[in-house]
Amino acid sequence: MIYGIFDLDDTLCLHRGNLEYEMIQPDTTLSHYLRSFPGDRYILTNATHDHAIEVLERMNILRLFKKIYARDTTQLMKPSLELARKVNEDIGITPNDTIYFFDDLIQNLWMGYSNGWTTVWIHPKHEQKYLYQWIHHGYISVSESLKDINTAKPL
């Protein structure tokens, strides 16, 4: 199986600073690529569950995610290795599965890498991914990364 585990703030919802809910708009390009992703999609955020729901609803992509893992529902925060193990267990991930983990913070990507996930750095400086051995891929946006995954380009 293939799974996508997505951070929320500054990864799916690019805002780089204070977020005002009124400014969040649906992103039809992102929605298209998320719908085309070849596996189940999950949110893993250090924000609260209510915040995640609010943002995903405003982006009109809430229904595309199977589950939200948030700090108030897991009682853990990234980059906790225990959190990554709990997510693996809850989803039912096996060693034969492929997990794409999308995040903007390098320390969170280390958590995913340490757990056997394929890491995707979403960041304006994504070209510098070579500086970090635990970052497999770097992109300016989730849409750009999913375009490659969904068109079967090897990442």
PLM segments and residue spans:
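Asp-based, Mg2+/Mn2+-dependent phosphohydrolase catalytic module
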Residues: 2-4, 14, 24, 57-67, ...
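Short, acidic loop-to-helix structural element flanking the phosphoryl-transfer center
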Residues: 18-42, 78-81
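Helix N-cap/beta->alpha junction signal
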Residues: 27, 45-48, 105
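Substrate-recognition element of Asp-dependent hydrolases with the DxDx(T/V) motif
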Residues: 32-57, 69-71
